[in-house]
């Protein structure tokens, strides 16, 4: 009888445990200008695992979670009045996280601004900032995970 109670209590405890997850794949289906895709994917996988672990349990044999970076937009806008110039680049990242067959879309935005006086910028397009990109990716992942 004691064994039966022990087995039943163990099964009850196991049924109430939270499911664990694993970030199995990261796909960058969008073009990443001036960046190596392998480095982008590796960084996103680490970020995704960190962010998902704040809400769910992560384990090596958990249910799969996939991340798809499907949109990278980086429009540049600028104003020039006489010797004064201000240029702003907004990096907009969109990710799709698939968990348990459901898709969650997240969007993140980060901005880079350059102001100059009496100095001409070499290139009207601002370079693709890695820190700005990482910030936008993190915001998009946080947005998608918050919808789970």
Where are these regions (language model features)?
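A structural "domain/chain start" motif
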Residues: 4-57, 61, 109, 143-148
């Amino acid at each position: 009888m004691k064994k039966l109670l022990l087995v039943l209590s163990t099964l009850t405890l196991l049924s109430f445990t939270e499911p664990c997850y694993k970030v199995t794949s990261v796909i960058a289906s969008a073009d990443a200008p001036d960046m190596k895709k392998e480095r982008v994917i590796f960084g996103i996988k680490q970020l995704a695992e960190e962010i998902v672990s704040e809400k769910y349990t992560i384990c090596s044999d958990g249910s799969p979670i996939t991340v798809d970076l499907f949109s990278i937009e980086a429009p540049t806008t600028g104003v020039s009045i006489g010797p004064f110039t201000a240029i702003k680049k907004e990096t907009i990242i969109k990710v799709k996280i698939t968990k348990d067959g459901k898709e969650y879309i997240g969007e993140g935005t980060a901005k880079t601004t350059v102001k100059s006086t009496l100095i001409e910028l070499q290139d009207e397009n601002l370079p693709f900032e890695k820190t700005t990109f990482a910030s936008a990716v993190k915001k998009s992942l946080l947005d998608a995970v918050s919808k789970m």
